[in-house]
Swiss-Prot record:
Protein name, per record: Serine/arginine-rich splicing factor 11
Protein keywords: Acetylation, Isopeptide bond, mRNA processing, mRNA splicing, Nucleus, Phosphoprotein, Repeat, RNA-binding, Ubl conjugation
SMART domains: RRM (SM00360)
Cross-link (Glycyl lysine isopeptide (Lys-Gly) (interchain with G-Cter in SUMO2)): K197, K211
């Protein structure tokens, strides 16, 4: 009963509508019992196919190509099923696109009604070929006949008039160019005869890659010029600044030299001042006779006593004038200046009357060389030192015989010569070697012994002690003036 109920519902729209037979007489109207099942999975066996289609109706015969035991590798298989009832074959077509194992089945009625042999069956393996086994009006959409004669038509026959009759009516000439027969030079001639049409190209044919390199070079050159110009401008503006800096640095270094109590520098300054003063006095002394020296020294002693006070006043006035315009390194320079000048004054006064320590105070006190000594002051200092030396000699000459004094003078002069010759002005500027300094330190120690003899002899004068006290009071007053 299930067959009879299902068959009419399917037979009405399906095969009965196709062949044109009546609803009941669909089977007699040329229906077939054999179906062709393509796109069967290669892993499917004939037993599985039998079970699948056995639900639809009684199966007379079932064959699977290639068979299960075939050694050939198979992409897909073909199965032919012959039902006992042709209606069950119609129902089986509904299994089309049913996925079996891993593929969708294609079920088509086979027109011949007999299961074919293996060779023919394998030719129908492809789904497109499977359609060729259908009846001309059966089942699926009709397929047009294959165009076997396309390759036989020559290309020359496919001109413009043959393709479209409307083009032939326009009277256009046919194609007269055969690219195979034309040579390259002929093509060039042909192209030269044609009038050129100029159209602006939207995209650049040659990519401008070189532009970036050239532009970068130009930029670099321009930047170089800019840098050169900047350097020139700065060079034109800054030389004044550089000179100022140099001046500042020089003044600073000078002030530092004043501050630092390095013994080597003080030695240099002492030797310089001594050399200048003694060199002139020596030359004069050598030219003069001892008698003349004595008379001159007495006169000079008197003069120096009278004129020393006036000189001190002049110096104070000059210092006041200078203090109105203080330099940058004012405080340090002023201290050093005032101290050095006071020491000089003390020496000038006390050295004339109290010759207890003729040389030793000179070494200790005149350490800081005043940086801005004028030529006039230098000359005055030289005169003072000359007068001092001559006074010392005159006092000692009174108490000792002439012969002894001459010997001493020779000795002292020779010692001074040794001292002053050892030092060079240029060498002082460049910097002293440690060995020279050691030698020079030894020499003053050796030369100090004859001077101490003179000191012991010259202590006896009583009036010198009194006058030194008076001088001390004067120095206190001068110190007060300087501090003001």
């Amino acid at each position: 009963m299930s067959n009879t109920t299902v068959v009419p519902s399917t037979a009405g729209p399906g095969p009965s509508g196709g062949p044109g037979g009546g609803g009941g007489g669909g089977g007699g109207g040329g229906g077939t019992e054999v179906i062709q099942v393509t796109n069967v999975s290669p892993s499917a066996s004939s037993e599985q196919m039998r079970t699948l289609f056995g639900f639809l109706g009684k199966i007379d015969e079932l064959r699977l190509f290639p068979p299960d035991d075939s050694p050939l590798p198979v992409s897909s298989r073909v199965c032919f099923v012959k039902f006992h009832d042709p209606d069950s074959a119609v129902v089986a077509q509904h299994l089309t696109n049913t996925v079996f194992v891993d593929r969708a089945l294609i079920v088509v009625p086979y027109a011949e009604g007999v299961i074919p042999d293996e060779a023919k069956a394998l030719s129908l393996l492809a789904p497109a070929n499977a359609v060729a086994g259908l009846l001309p009006g059966g089942g699926l959409l009709p397929t047009p006949n294959p165009l076997t004669q396309i390759g036989a038509v020559p290309l020359a026959a496919l001109g413009a008039p043959t393709l479209d009759p409307a083009l032939a009516a326009l009277g256009l000439p046919g194609a007269n160019l055969n690219s195979q027969s034309l040579a390259a030079d002929q093509l060039l001639k042909l192209m030269s005869t044609v009038d050129p049409k100029l159209n602006h190209v939207a995209a650049g044919l040659v990519s401008p890659s070189l532009k970036s390199d050239t532009s970068s070079k130009e930029i670099e050159e321009a930047m170089k010029r800019v840098r050169e110009a900047q350097s020139l401008i700065s060079a034109a503006i800054e030389p004044d600044k550089k000179e100022e800096k140099r001046r500042h640095s020089r003044s600073r270094s000078r002030s530092r030299r004043r501050r630092t109590p390095s013994s080597s520098r003080h030695r240099r300054s002492r030797s310089r001042s001594r050399r200048r003063s003694h060199s002139k006095s020596r030359s004069r002394r050598r030219s003069k006779s001892p008698r003349r020296r004595r008379s001159h020294s007495r006169e000079r002693g008197r003069r120096s006593r009278s004129t020393s006070k006036t000189r001190d006043k002049k110096k104070e006035d000059k210092e006041k004038k200078r203090s109105k315009t203080p330099p940058k390194s004012y405080s340090t320079a002023r201290r050093s200046r005032s101290a050095s000048r006071e020491r000089r004054r003390r020496r000038s006064r006390s050295g004339t009357r109290s010759p207890k320590k003729p040389r030793s105070p000179k070494r200790k006190l005149s350490r800081s060389p005043s940086p801005r000594r004028h030529k006039k002051e230098k000359k005055k200092d030289k005169d003072k030192e000359r007068s001092r030396d001559e006074r010392e000699r005159s006092t000692s000459k009174k108490k000792k015989s002439k012969d002894k004094e001459k010997d001493r003078e020779r000795k002292s002069e020779s010692d001074k010569d040794v001292k002053q010759v050892t030092r060079d002005y240029d060498e002082e500027e460049q910097g002293y070697d440690s060995e020279k300094e050691k030698k020079e330190e030894k020499k003053p120690i050796e030369t100090g012994s004859p001077k101490t003899k003179e000191c012991s002899v010259e202590k006896g004068t009583g009036d010198s002690l009194r006058e030194s006290k008076v001088n001390g009071d004067d120095h206190h007053e001068e110190d007060m003036d300087m501090s003001d």
